[in-house]
Swiss-Prot record:
The record marks 18 as: Transition state stabilizer. Pathway: Metabolic intermediate biosynthesis; chorismate biosynthesis; chorismate from D-erythrose 4-phosphate and phosphoenolpyruvate: step 3/7. The keyword Amino-acid biosynthesis applies. Belongs to the type-II 3-dehydroquinase family. GO terms for biological process: amino acid biosynthetic process; aromatic amino acid family biosynthetic process; chorismate biosynthetic process; quinate catabolic process. Keywords: Amino-acid biosynthesis, Aromatic amino acid biosynthesis, Lyase. This is 3-dehydroquinate dehydratase. The gene is aroQ. It comes from Syntrophotalea carbinolica (strain DSM 2380 / NBRC 103641 / GraBd1) (Pelobacter carbinolicus). The lineage of its organism: Bacteria, Pseudomonadati, Thermodesulfobacteriota, Desulfuromonadia, Desulfuromonadales.
Length: 148
């Protein structure tokens, strides 16, 4: 069975508590449950991983390379805008990458408009709340089908 790795970056463990105007009230645990349901509907295995530690995220990405995951969906949180370490780790992957954000990063503060990940990703989905993850999984599923 194909496997998609969903990566949640820094501060995303605070979904449901942090800035509900931008991120809503759904918790990360609830988001992960929905992700599992959507993945089952799309016919692939999914693993969700969240950390607030950049080195741990890089290590999980390195492990994904060794595991030959079929696709990665990533919401790197604030790391999106400045973490060249995360970007360098993602560049190692052979699997397609889909970047997602719950809020529309292009309609927010200027510093959020730039993504160091975007150039590595097949595409970026943002601004649709929790549905950004669903759309990201659909994109990942389609990319897996195209690349195999």
């Amino acid at each position: 069975m194909k496997k998609v790795l969903v990566l949640h970056g820094i501060n995303l463990n605070m979904f449901g508590k942090r800035d509900p105007a931008h991120y809503g009230t759904t918790t990360l645990k609830e988001i992960d449950a929905r992700i599992s349901e959507w993945a089952a509907e799309l016919g692939f295995e999914v693993e969700c991983f969240q950390t607030n530690h950049e080195g741990e995220m890089a290590s999980r990405i390195h492990a994904a390379h060794e595991e030959n995951v079929d696709a990665v969906v990533i919401n790197a949180g604030a790391w999106t805008h400045y973490s060249y370490g995360i970007a360098d780790a993602l560049a190692i992957l052979k699997a397609p990458i889909v970047e997602v954000h719950m809020s529309n990063i292009h309609a927010r503060e200027e510093f959020r408009h730039h993504s160091v990940i975007a150039g590595l990703a097949k595409g970026q989905i943002c601004g649709f709340g929790v549905d950004s993850y669903h759309l990201g999984l659909i994109a990942a599923s389609n990319l897996i089908k195209v690349e195999n």
